[in-house]
Amino acid sequence: FLSRTPAFDHDLGFLIFCSYGNGYRLTQNPAYKQVILDTADTLATLFKPQVGTMLSWPRNVELFGGHNTIMDNMINLEMLFWAAKNGGNPYLADIAISHADKTMKYHFRPDYTSYHVAVYDTLTGDFIKGVTHQGYADNSMWARGQAWAVYGYTVVYRETKDCRYLDFVQKVTDVYLKNLPE
């Protein structure tokens, strides 16, 4: 695969791209760029092609009863797109697009509110269920996750120029804004 270093958690985009990404943007220090490229490769080890998404919590597969993908992972896609355009493996962009597409299909209810966690069969990739881990209830909108989706799908649209993502993020944003307190 892309990296010999396995990822033990999905939070690599949060931890690395926010800091090293801005560090590289401001200083052009090549050491920062290399950290980002290496981290993107490591994050890619969580991608399961049979599912089409990155696994979020490898240590919790048994707890959730399958391949678990959380909405937070949408934030990581920006680092994958960046790495693919800046000397990394172009396949990283394919991973980001696959993850966004599968998340768009199964992580949202018909009213465009999101689950915190989507659980997939580890062998077939079939969607099993949507649940919450940090939100109020499995059938409630998780506000923080909804915000992750707004940011993540805006990035996916910016990087792909595919209007499907723009249309989708507008609907996700509308339901989020509609549910804010007055």
Question: Which ranges hold each PLM region?
Answer:
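Glycan-recognition and catalytic cores of secretory/periplasmic carbohydrate-active enzymes
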Residues: F1-E182
